[in-house]
Amino acid sequence: MFMINLLVVILSALVAMAFLTLTERKVLGYMQFRKGPNIVGPYGTLQPIADAMKLFTKEPLLPTSSTSTLYLIAPTLALSISLLLWTPLPMPYPLMNFNLGLLFILATSSLAVYSILWSGWASNSNYALIGALRAVAQTISYEVTLAIILLSVLLMSGSFNLQSLITTQEHSWLLFPSWPLAMMWFISTLAETNRAPFDLTEGESELVSGFNIEYAAGSFALFFMAEYMNIIMMNALTTTIFLAAPHNTAAPETYTINFMTKTLLLTTLFLWIRTAYPRFRYDQLMHLLWKNFLPLTLALCMWYISMPTLTSGIPPQT
């Protein structure tokens, strides 16, 4: 039974990722007053399948000066990590119910840095290496903020378990008491997934394509798939942490519909931000974190830590 559940989660994530690429191209198209993909299938709905066939049937090229082992392992590792992150997410029941689910997600997502670093170094290209170093610095920096925000949320829910987070939000979303944290979390997830306006790793005018410049065919597709699955996973996590729906045991499908709708809206917001905002300069990106987000998140974390002590003398309200 576990293997069937695992296959269902993997296939669902892959299908969602495939159609997210189509949605992005459609949204970008309409926002720029053009149609987007509309040739393959009705209204272009089969475009992701055509893209997959094209990429996976092309000849995989290995640069002669590259370190072949790491060069081939890096995209596989990126995709494996992005799939592994889905295991503790409650949809409405998780694949594996960890007591430390949030800690597992934070620790596993930080491993994605290695795939980027290995791909940049193993490609033996200056552009790829600079893109990889940028990505690593950016990801590690913003993980600090994500960890502190998660700690603040845990102080409100009292557990690392994602199911208990949903129980905490049975009557009210955690978005309301912690909206500054939610705003900083959302912006940090943009930076964590290397999306515009924080896509410094793929600065076309400077780095051609970034850390994946030497990749083609199937290996390039694996990086592409990992990036888009991380986007959906991060938005699913945002929904669970700040916008969780009450879990009705009599009709669990209502939770799934609610969860999917909110995740889809947040993902569409990711795409809208890409069309609306120009790319940040690298120093602005780092200043935003180290000079703005970090002091604010630390101050708010201290506030949430001190709240139980400050309110301990207040009698219970009946």
Swiss-Prot record:
One of its GO terms (cellular component) is mitochondrial inner membrane. InterPro entries: NADH_UbQ_OxRdtase_su1/FPO, NADH_UbQ_OxRdtase_su1_CS. It is an enzyme of class 7 (translocase). It comes from the Eukaryota. Pfam families: NADHdh. This is NADH-ubiquinone oxidoreductase chain 1. Keywords: Electron transport, Membrane, Mitochondrion, Mitochondrion inner membrane, NAD, Respiratory chain, Translocase, Transmembrane, Transmembrane helix, Transport, Ubiquinone. It is found in: Mitochondrion inner membrane. Core subunit of respiratory chain NADH dehydrogenase (Complex I) which is composed of 45 different subunits. It comes from Saguinus oedipus (Cotton-top tamarin). It is a multi-pass membrane protein.
